[in-house]
């Protein structure tokens, strides 16, 4: 006996597979209680940072993850699930939904960041990291400080020599 696979489910599977193609950072959110307007607001904020948000069917998502050899994520696929993906600067995307959590019923379930499973606590810590731009700025200020100090010292030295 051969079971016929629902073409709509095959289409959803392929769509989700395409959605995850080339994405190393995947977050799972529980959107229970969010209005359509709030979910749309979150989606827009995520898209402004080059991320994507999609509401998924858990069983199909489990199959896609299995197909991609991504293990240990089934526990995040319970209840209403929205999946957020990010190509780079994943912590920027994580900051967005953690800010959103403060003012809504949104809950963070967990994620998959650069090949590693992150639980909610680890994702929260990850969201606190500086962005790439902030890290570069911080690094540049650290490099610049000794040079600024040297310049001020030389200026003070030249001022002293001019006075004498």
Swiss-Prot record:
Native source organism of the sequence: Borrelia hermsii (strain HS1 / DAH)
Protein family according to the UniProt entry: Belongs to the universal ribosomal protein uL10 family.
Subunit structure, interactors included: Part of the ribosomal stalk of the 50S ribosomal subunit. The N-terminus interacts with L11 and the large rRNA to form the base of the stalk. The C-terminus forms an elongated spine to which L12 dimers bind in a sequential fashion forming a multimeric L10(L12)X complex.
Gene Ontology molecular function: any one: structural constituent of ribosome
Pfam families for the chain: Ribosomal_L10
Lineage: superkingdom: Bacteria
Biological processes annotated in GO: translation
Matches recorded under HAMAP family: Ribosomal_uL10 (MF_00362)
GO CC, any one term: large ribosomal subunit
Name of the protein in question: Large ribosomal subunit protein uL10
Its biological purpose: Forms part of the ribosomal stalk, playing a central role in the interaction of the ribosome with GTP-bound translation factors.
Gene3D superfamilies linked to this entry: 3.30.70.1730, 6.10.250.2350
PROSITE patterns, A to Z: RIBOSOMAL_L10 (PS01109)
Stretches of the chain forming a coiled coil according to its record: none
Alphabetic keyword roster: Ribonucleoprotein, Ribosomal protein, RNA-binding, rRNA-binding
InterPro entries named in the record: Ribosomal_uL10, Ribosomal_uL10-like_sf, Ribosomal_uL10_bac, Ribosomal_uL10_bac_type, Ribosomal_uL10_CS_bac
